[in-house]
From Swiss-Prot:
<keyword id="KW-0689">Ribosomal protein</keyword>
<dbReference type="Pfam" id="PF01196">
    <property type="entry name" value="Ribosomal_L17"/>
</dbReference>
<protein>
    <recommendedName>
        <fullName>Large ribosomal subunit protein bL17</fullName>
    </recommendedName>
</protein>
<keyword id="KW-0687">Ribonucleoprotein</keyword>
<dbReference type="InterPro" id="IPR036373">
    <property type="entry name" value="Ribosomal_bL17_sf"/>
</dbReference>
<dbReference type="InterPro" id="IPR000456">
    <property type="entry name" value="Ribosomal_bL17"/>
</dbReference>
<comment type="similarity">
    <text>Belongs to the bacterial ribosomal protein bL17 family.</text>
</comment>
<dbReference type="InterPro" id="IPR047859">
    <property type="entry name" value="Ribosomal_bL17_CS"/>
</dbReference>
<comment type="subunit">
    <text>Part of the 50S ribosomal subunit. Contacts protein L32.</text>
</comment>
<dbReference type="GO" id="GO:0022625">
    <property type="term" value="C:cytosolic large ribosomal subunit"/>
</dbReference>
<dbReference type="GO" id="GO:0003735">
    <property type="term" value="F:structural constituent of ribosome"/>
</dbReference>
<dbReference type="GO" id="GO:0006412">
    <property type="term" value="P:translation"/>
</dbReference>
Length: 118
């Protein structure tokens, strides 16, 4: 039975899945929007939103926690210097997912996940 199994496996081990989410989160923070499969985008959304919520506090502890999940120092700096203050008054919902159709090669459903900065 599948009861209480919240996350998608994405056909990866837990270590591979965490590495994938860290890479996607780093790219999203750096670029502001990325295109990936719909399942990965839906799994990435709560991961990134928790990082942004931590960045809103701006504490040293929050910066160290975010450093565990963001691979590049530049992305972590952008998270705390730009995104945290930009979302300071917004109570969650920092990202949006837009479906973009099917991938030509294998028919996978693609989606664009982007930060809502306005």
């Amino acid at each position: 039975m599948r009861h209480r199994k919240a996350n998608r496996q994405l056909r990866r081990t837990s270590e591979q899945r965490l590495a994938l989410l860290r890479n996607l989160a780093t790219s999203l923070i750096e670029q502001g929007a990325i295109e990936t499969t719909e399942a990965k985008a839906k799994e990435l959304r709560p991961f990134v939103e928790k990082l942004i919520t931590k960045a809103r506090t701006g504490t040293l502890h929050a910066r160290r926690l975010a450093g565990k999940h963001v691979h590049k120092r530049e992305a972590a700096d952008k998270l705390f210097q730009e995104l945290g203050p930009a979302f300071a008054t917004r109570p969650g919902g920092y990202t949006r997912i837009l479906k973009t159709g099917h991938r030509k090669g294998d028919g996978a459903e693609m989606a664009r996940i982007e930060l809502i900065l306005s």
